[in-house]
Amino acid sequence: MTLANHSALENTIPPANHPYFGHPGCFLKFCNEVRQYTDLPICGVGGLNDPDFVEQQLFDGHIQCAAMSRQLLADPDWVNKLKNGQAKQIYRCVRCNKKCLGGLMAHQGTRCAYDALREKETQKA
């Protein structure tokens, strides 16, 4: 469940400092509204970077699945790290929109501000 405002992309992909959608799980409140009208599974999205928060939303039945874009750009190994008990090593998306949305808008592809840091760590290993 998300929103789309094609005249202002920052409302569709909000940064952490967005006045209305700056908090984790920023679109989840709409999932509860939609739940009143359907029994179909609802997928939540929007600032889902904390595994414990996501798990609680699933457990509470607010969502039946979680979608992540920027978070998986920030740490493509998110799922594997959780599976291997390495949640504290997850790079959490800070929702800066610098390289992901910024790169997309500049036609430079989608990357993440963490890419350089991860590349340095890989070279050290």
Give each language-model segment a name.
Residues M1-A125:
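Flavin-dependent oxidoreductase catalytic cores
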